[in-house]
Amino acid sequence: MAELFYDADADLSIIQGRKVAVIGYGSQGHAHALSLRDSGVDVRVGLHEGSKSKAKAEEQGLRVVPVAEAAAEADVIMILVPDPIQAEVYEKDIKDNLKDGDALFFGHGLNIRYGFVKPPAGVDVCMVAPKGPGHLVRRQYEEGRGVPCLVAVEQDATGNAFALALSYAKGIGGTRAGVIRTTFTEETETDLFGEQAVLAGGVTALVKAGFETLTEAGYQPEIAYFECLHELKLIVDLMYEGGLEKMRWSISETAEWGDYVTGPRIITDVTKAEMRKVLAEIQDGTFAKNWMDEYHGGLKKYNEYKKQDSEHLLETTGKELRKLMSWVDEEA
């Protein structure tokens, strides 16, 4: 079972005694920087020259400096720029500013897991990964609550890396909800698998296949959209609140019976075997290498896939139907 840690297990004074640089000011960056500041931590934000986020960070009362300067000043450096550019930012602005005893933090383990970033032996390497988007992390913190976090230590140069990581998690509200101890390898591999096989890749492929099956059989695209995409939110919300049990308790007996007898015909042993192949490609680094090659090669295939899906009948139908739904903008 998972090892859980709460407020009483973490010493906030540890992170309060350090100088923290948050590199990046996107979804997670703003939540980390503002919440750490409000927890009494000495924070600066490191941004590249010309960053559009600079004005926003300064308006919110944070000190913004170039990335290299932030790294030189701080002894805890949290890298929260997008995965594909982390290695470049590290090599250019962070690597030469690290000192023995410093700590390098990440919000996701990809660049450490696959060796794109190789920290020196004298620094702690930790991860604090909230299991929610940045706006939720910040809102929960402000309301006196928190979002559960994953915490990991890849390199414990000082002997105090885990205590430091727990302290950091407490500074952003994570220990109020609960912190789960993991490893960089476990977090990275499960995160990528979940995204590809279930949450993004799996769901979008399932929705498109269902929509295409109905429209190819002569049903109206609008009706197919409602049945295969729109109502997905109702089911996912129920699962989010109470797992499969609450979802099945809430739907009709007809729908529940269809779940039991038809679901296994759609997600078959063949599908699961393909999932195992996907996991193997994540574990052996194939996916990470291919993704980095694609990104640094100009994103040609990525943009082709994106364009194809934007022109799919599912998408064009949805754009028109959502104009009928006044509540959609209100929920966004």
Swiss-Prot record:
- Could you list this entry's UniProt keywords, alphabetically sorted: Amino-acid biosynthesis, Branched-chain amino acid biosynthesis, Magnesium, Metal-binding, NADP, Oxidoreductase
Which InterPro entries does the entry mention?
6-PGluconate_DH-like_C_sf, KARI, KARI_C, KARI_N, KARI_prok, NAD(P)-bd_dom_sf
Q: What is the top EC class of this enzyme, as a single word?
A: oxidoreductase
Amino-acid positions noted as binding Mg(2+) 1 in the UniProt annotation, renumbered to this chain: D191, E195
Record's cofactor remark: Binds 2 magnesium ions per subunit.
Catalytic function, reaction form? (2R)-2,3-dihydroxy-3-methylbutanoate + NADP(+) = (2S)-2-acetolactate + NADPH + H(+); (2R,3R)-2,3-dihydroxy-3-methylpentanoate + NADP(+) = (S)-2-ethyl-2-hydroxy-3-oxobutanoate + NADPH + H(+)
- In this protein, the active site sits at H108
Q: Which Pfam families match?
A: KARI_C (PF01450), KARI_N (PF07991)
As cofactor, the record names:
Mg(2+)
Ranges for domain KARI C-terminal knotted: 183-328
EC nos? 1.1.1.86
A single MF term (Gene Ontology): NADP binding
Name the pathway it acts in.
Amino-acid biosynthesis; L-isoleucine biosynthesis; L-isoleucine from 2-oxobutanoate: step 2/4; Amino-acid biosynthesis; L-valine biosynthesis; L-valine from pyruvate: step 2/4
Domain KARI N-terminal Rossmann, residue spans: 2-182
Q: Where does NADP(+) bind?
A: Y25, G26, S27, Q28, S51, S53, D83, P84, I85, Q86, G134
Binding positions (substrate): S252
Where along the chain is Mg(2+) 2 bound? D191, E227, E231
Q: Which GO terms describe its cellular component?
A: cytosol
* Any one biological process term the GO annotation gives: isoleucine biosynthetic process
UniProt KW Magnesium keyword: yes
Assigned protein family? Belongs to the ketol-acid reductoisomerase family.
State the NCBIfam families in the record: ilvC, PRK05479.1, PRK13403.1
Tell me, in a sentence or two, what this protein's role is: Involved in the biosynthesis of branched-chain amino acids (BCAA). Catalyzes an alkyl-migration followed by a ketol-acid reduction of (S)-2-acetolactate (S2AL) to yield (R)-2,3-dihydroxy-isovalerate. In the isomerase reaction, S2AL is rearranged via a Mg-dependent methyl migration to produce 3-hydroxy-3-methyl-2-ketobutyrate (HMKB). In the reductase reaction, this 2-ketoacid undergoes a metal-dependent reduction by NADPH to yield (R)-2,3-dihydroxy-isovalerate.
Q: Can you say what this protein is called?
A: Ketol-acid reductoisomerase (NADP(+)) 2
**Naturally occurring in which organism (per UniProt):** Streptomyces coelicolor (strain ATCC BAA-471 / A3(2) / M145)
Q: Taxonomy-wise, where does this protein's organism fall, top ranks first?
A: Bacteria, Bacillati, Actinomycetota, Actinomycetes, Kitasatosporales
